[in-house]
Amino acid sequence: MIKQLNQNEIDEIRKKIDSFKTDDYYKYYFDETEENNPDKAFLIDDKYYIDFTIYNDICFMGVIDISKEIKTTSNSVYELLKLFDEQLKYYQKIAQWCYKANKIAYRFHKFLKKKYNCVSFEDKEKSMIGVILLWKDMKA
């Protein structure tokens, strides 16, 4: 189930996420270079927090598992892709970065490269991808 969050809910989850910074499981989720003030945020199945934040006129999508005790279901993955498609129609382009050592996120990048028109860049540590909605892909 996808739930769009209000500002109070976002603030509560951000506090929880901040507490993960010392947890080794989450070591690949943080990059302290930018403040995160989401334009929109969602929760999928009480497990995945997804936010869409604008940096320099580009929408970045962030995804974090906030409840590693809950098992991932195929429905969660379907909901994530559904949300991505909906927000791509809204924002027209979405970027995402990850540490390549974060195998789950890096696999998601590879999937996006196969499914969508995108540009990508990789260095030794990070992968960055930008997905662009083309005119031919827009549905009325």
Question: Model regions: which residues?
Answer:
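Conserved catalytic-core motifs of GNAT/GCN5-like acyltransferases
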Residues: 97, 115-132
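Short amphipathic alpha-helix that is part of the acyltransferase structural core
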Residues: 1-28
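Conserved acetyl-CoA-binding loop-helix of GNAT-fold acetyltransferases
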Residues: 72-87, 107, 111
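A conserved beta-strand-loop-helix scaffold within acyl/acetyltransferase catalytic domains
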Residues: 31-36, 47-58
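Conserved beta-strand-loop-alpha-helix junction that forms the acyl-donor binding cleft
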Residues: 95-110, 124-126
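Cytosolic beta-strand hydrophobic patch enriched in CBS
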Residues: 41-45
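Conserved acetyl-CoA binding element of GNAT-fold acetyltransferases
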Residues: 55-69
